[in-house]
């Protein structure tokens, strides 16, 4: 038995060394640029589709309006949106001592499924980020209600700290039995707008920090590339004969986190759950033209499907996609083989929907399997999203961002848009 353990330890050490050799060695300082605070859009424009649109194609960068988007899409393309819905996941509590504790709901723990979580009554548990957590001495917190709002008071919402870790905590919420948790959040919570806006959530954010096509509750950050789309723009896309489809990835708070380590290989990606249907996978296989992804969350979902398919082929089930799975070895399967493997698994299990998770990080050197065109906003310096843009443009991100900075484009969540063509 002892010999087996020694062999196992040696194997793990060798595997770790080999893995480090295969992971791209990328210094995050190479993906920095000067972003003045005045270039960060703190509020949305009056009209969603009145934003500017940068087009990068064949090495050329040009300025359009977002209403020009449909005319720039290839006629044979299929455009994919992320139809997740942002939930008012930020809650403010108060200790009896008067200390304020902010709780940011990240991921359901009990019930674990999002649909069940939002329907549950009486109590539930979430993985959370807790502000001022050191001041929370394991006592029960009451919801902060400074204006004695009767509707909020009637909820009788309380919070108990169940488990504390370095970055997150498990919190149990209790409230009156007759109301689903989705309604509790609607009444008691606030929309968690990005911290770089440097302001509190306002009435305008309830509508504008949400896409028009948002459908399934679960995100704590909006898939902001979709904020520009209006019914008029969508109708123009349909009139061009372009197929519109959706995936659903619930965006986590990790989207706000910069890469703090000097080497990207030392950065840890958070798991994000996603859902696709078998019918969508069949349409994806049948599509012969260009694939347009709206937002980096759609890209990560679509590109993860290949590795989910590989897991179905090699392991017999759709194991979550690991952060470095695309880089650790070569995979000899075609995209069609991978997608068909997922469908076969779903058919065998009688599933209409596949629920899976991904930690995939897309960095320079990544081999794109599905996405040809990307619609996206302008991202923070030294972020994993900027690494994705660099990977997509094969290193030409600086040209695009220099052009945007030099031509008065607005940056980040409420900023302007871009459409990028991968050559």
Descriptions of predicted regions:
Residues 7-9, 13-18:
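Short, positively charged and aromatic/hydrophobic N-terminal segments
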Residues 22-423:
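Surface-exposed, charge/polar-rich loops and edge strands
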């Amino acid at each position: 038995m002892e010999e087996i353990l020694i062999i196992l330890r040696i194997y793990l050490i060798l595997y770790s060394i080999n893995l480090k050799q295969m992971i791209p060695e990328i210094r995050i300082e190479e993906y920095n640029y000067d972003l003045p605070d005045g270039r960060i859009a703190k509020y949305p424009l009056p009209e969603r589709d009145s934003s500017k649109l940068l087009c990068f194609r064949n090495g050329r960068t040009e300025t359009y309006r977002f209403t020009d988007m449909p005319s720039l899409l290839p006629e044979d393309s299929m455009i994919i949106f992320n139809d997740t819905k942002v939930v008012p996941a930020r809650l403010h509590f108060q200790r009896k001592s008067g200390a304020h504790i902010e709780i940011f709901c990240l991921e359901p723990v009990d019930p674990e499924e999002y649909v069940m979580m939002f329907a549950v009554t009486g109590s539930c548990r979430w993985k959370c980020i807790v502000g001022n957590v050191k001041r929370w001495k394991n006592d029960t917190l009451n919801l902060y209600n400074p204006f004695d709002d009767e509707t909020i008071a009637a909820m009788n919402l309380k919070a108990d700290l169940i488990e504390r870790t370095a970055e997150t905590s498990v919190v149990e919420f209790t409230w009156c039995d007759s109301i689903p948790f989705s309604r509790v959040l609607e009444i008691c919570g606030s929309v968690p707008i990005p911290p770089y806006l440097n302001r509190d959530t306002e009435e305008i954010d309830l509508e504008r920090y949400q896409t028009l096509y948002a459908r399934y509750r679960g995100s704590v950050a909006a898939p902001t590339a979709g904020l520009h789309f209006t019914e008029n723009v969508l109708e123009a896309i349909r009139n061009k004969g372009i197929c519109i489809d959706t995936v659903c990835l619930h965006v986590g708070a990790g989207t706000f986190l910069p890469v703090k380590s000097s080497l990207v290989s030392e950065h840890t990606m958070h798991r994000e759950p996603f859902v696709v249907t078998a019918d969508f996978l069949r349409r994806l296989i049948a599509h012969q033209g260009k694939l347009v992804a709206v937002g980096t969350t759609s890209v990560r979902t679509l590109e993860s499907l290949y590795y989910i398919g590989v897991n179905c082929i090699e392991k017999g089930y759709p194991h979550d996609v690991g952060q470095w799975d695309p880089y650790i070895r070569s995979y000899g399967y075609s995209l069609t083989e991978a997608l068909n493997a997922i469908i076969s698994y779903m058919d065998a299990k009688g599933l209409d929907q596949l629920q899976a998770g991904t930690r995939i990080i897309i960095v320079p050197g990544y081999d794109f399997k599905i996405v040809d065109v990307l619609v996206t906003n302008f991202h923070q310096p030294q972020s994993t999203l900027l690494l994705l843009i660099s990977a997509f443009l094969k290193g030409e991100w600086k040209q695009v961002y220099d052009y945007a900075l030099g031509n008065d484009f607005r940056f980040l969540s409420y900023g302007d848009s871009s459409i990028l063509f991968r050559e």
